[in-house]
Amino acid sequence: MNTKNLLITGMFAGLFLSCKEVEPPAPVLPVPTPEQIKWQKMENYAFVHFGLNTFNDLEWGYGNTPAETFNPTDLDCEQWVRIIKAAGLKGVILTAKHHDGFCLWPTKTVDYNISNSPYKNGKGDMVRELSDACKKHGLKFGLY
């Protein structure tokens, strides 16, 4: 009986020792780049469009709506970010200048911007406010 057990054990040992690791096959192209993989891991983001058309009830603006139209009285970017984070999104992308040309940040390059609106008496900067809120709450922030 011992000889039989020894023989069976020896056969299994020989079988397992003869197995060697085989290299996996080369991937079939195209293979995603590290940047593409990083992009996929970002998952869902909030894409925020908030500008002059929010206040003039138009679907499409042509750059002829006065900058004074932009006047959010209770804008709370932190509230947006808290809700976005609670919804499980990973970050926020803000349309900082839509097709109508209105800039949501103060700039000296064009007059059609937030500094020429009544929002915070012309001292507002929605890009900065949303960016700061994202940093505070640990979300990524991007601009479109």
Task: Give the ranges of each region predicted by the language model.
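Mature catalytic domains of secreted/periplasmic carbohydrate-active enzymes
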Residues: E21-Y144
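Bacterial Sec-dependent N-terminal signal peptides
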Residues: M1-P24
